[in-house]
Amino acid sequence: MKTGALIEAAVVMGGLLRGASEVDLAALRRIGGLLGLGFQIKDDLLDAEADSATLGKTAGKDEAQGKSTYVTLLGLDGARARLDVVAAELDAALLAFAAARPAPANDAMPANDNGQALADLAVMAVRRSR
């Protein structure tokens, strides 16, 4: 799950760069972890179900290489169900994070989008078709 760990780290680093509190960093770790997990499950599903033309890379490589994936561990239906659970948990975590974000108190700070960019990334990661 190297890609998932990288995604989690990137989300947390964004918070660190913005001077996030420990509470916010914990929330960002959770969001990043779920985002990374969702991305990985979706990647495994796409590798098993999509064709190479749609993916833009060779489909079925994980199975051909004997890799352990969410699809090999849970089956297609199980991996889809797990992705649905992760996506719902991610949505809830993003909503809670956005609700806790006040608007910036001064004009020197960029406008606060209450995590909209992160939410958009989450949707792309777990609902993508390639």
Describe the residue ranges of each PLM region.
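All-alpha prenyltransferase/terpene-synthase fold signal
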Residues: 1-130
